[in-house]
Every structure is written in structure tokens, then in C-alpha cells.
């Protein structure tokens, strides 16, 4: 097994990416931060994306938070997912920012959500709060694409949520909408407003929204992965 190495170039193919990710499994965040020469924050309250930034150093990711995937040349998106001692996800997973205007004629097939979730490298990370940040270990990664059933679940929720946005109902959408995909505000502060369509078709200002995968979607996905590892 390779030891963790900081990569400044993107992986040439999917297998190379998986091998880079596998080399991180079992290491804790303090060890990896030391190798990458990245300061370890006291906690993630002000540095929510820090783990992703750290792992990108070892994986050679390039896209950041752009609409394209993290590894555009090979069509793979990186998602870190905090898990508890049972391997269950501790929180929802951000997919992408939701477009609140200019949505006439938009389809699931051409959506950012579908594009981002077409091929995902999931990296589980210990996330229980009683474990100090530096001692949290990286889990075994998996590369995943949605099954037909999973894609259908995602499409149904996406279409329902987008219909509400287009019909000027964005402010009535709650986190309870959607079986596996939810829409909720994504802003560090409540002053960051963006334009949307109001109830009567008028322009309004509202908080930016993001699409998130619910734990009911990611939990069985991870459970299958960990079951395969133990067999």
C-alpha cells in the first residue's frame, strides 16, 4: 500500500485516484495535516471545508466549488462524509448550489445535481464530536455511481423541488420536502441574499439555497460498502 503523498497534478485515471484515496485510509487528520504542511484548526466551526481542502492536496483535485466535478478530466466528484462509530453518516451531504432563476426548460438530464452525482469518490471520516479533530481517522474510500433506482429517487425529488422554485414557492420549501434530496439555505450569514422568483412571478431576494443528500440516502449506500469490506 502506498503511503500518503501530496499530489500537485490530477490523477490520470479513476484507478489512480482510488489508489491515492486508499493510501489515506487509517491515517488521522493530524498526521495528514503534518505531511501536507497545513495548519490544523482547533475545530471545524469556522473551517467547515477544511477536511475537503486537506484531502484534495493528496488527491490532486482542481475544481474546488465550481459547477464541474472535482476531477473534471476523469468525471469524478469528491465527497467527504463524517460517520459515527457504526459507520452511519452524521449529517446531510452538500451537492451543489441550487439555481433560483433562469430555470425555464431545465431538465434532470442537464442538471448540476445529476452531473455532480454521476460518479462520486466517497471518503468516510470519523466525525463524532468526542474525538478531537486531529485524532479523527480516514476510512476506506469507495467510487460510486447511482443505480437506476437511486437515480429515479433523485430525479423525482429534484423535479419536485425545481417545480416549486419555478412556481415561486422557494420560501415555502422546507428540509422535509424530498425523500432523499433536500433544498435548504446555504449561507454563512443571513445578509448574503440572492435573486429568486416570488409567488406572483416578481423578483425577490432570498437566501441562497443548496441541494443536500439526506442521511436516508447515504446511510444505506455506506452500509453496503462496509458490508462488502467485511465479507
From Swiss-Prot:
GO terms for cellular component: cytoplasm. One of its GO terms (biological process) is mismatch repair. GO terms for molecular function: DNA binding; endonuclease activity. CDD domains: MutH-like. Pfam families: MutH. Its main location: cytoplasm. Sequence-specific endonuclease that cleaves unmethylated GATC sequences. It is involved in DNA mismatch repair. This is DNA mismatch repair protein MutH.
Amino acid at each position: 500500500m502506498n503511503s500518503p503523498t501530496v499530489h500537485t497534478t490530477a490523477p490520470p485515471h479513476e484507478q489512480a485516484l482510488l489508489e491515492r484515496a486508499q493510501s489515506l485510509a487509517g491515517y488521522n487528520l493530524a498526521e495528514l495535516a503534518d505531511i501536507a504542511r497545513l495548519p490544523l484548526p482547533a475545530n471545524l466551526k469556522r473551517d467547515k471545508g477544511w477536511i475537503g481542502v486537506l484531502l484534495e492536496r493528496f488527491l490532486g483535485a482542481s475544481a474546488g466549488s465550481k459547477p464541474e466535478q472535482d476531477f473534471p478530466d476523469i468525471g469524478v466528484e469528491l465527497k467527504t462524509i463524517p460517520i459515527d462509530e457504526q459507520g452511519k453518516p452524521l449529517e446531510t451531504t452538500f451537492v451543489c448550489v441550487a439555481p433560483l432563476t433562469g430555470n425555464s426548460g431545465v431538465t434532470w438530464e442537464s442538471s448540476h445535481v445529476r452531473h455532480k452525482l454521476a460518479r462520486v469518490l466517497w471518503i468516510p471520516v470519523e466525525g463524532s464530536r468526542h474525538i478531537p479533530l486531529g485524532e479523527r481517522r480516514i476510512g476506506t474510500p469507495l467510487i460510486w455511481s447511482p443505480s437506476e433506482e437511486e437515480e429515479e429517487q433523485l430525479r423525482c425529488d429534484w423535479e419536485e423541488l425545481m417545480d416549486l422554485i419555478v412556481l415561486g414557492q422557494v420560501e415555502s420549501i422546507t428540509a422535509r420536502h424530498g425523500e432523499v434530496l433536500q433544498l435548504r439555505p446555504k449561507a454563512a450569514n443571513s445578509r448574503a441574499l440572492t435573486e429568486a422568483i416570488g409567488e406572483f412571478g416578481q423578483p425577490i431576494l432570498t437566501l441562497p439555497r443548496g441541494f443536500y443528500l439526506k442521511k436516508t440516502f447515504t446511510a444505506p449506500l455506506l452500509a453496503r460498502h462496509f458490508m462488502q469490506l467485511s465479507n
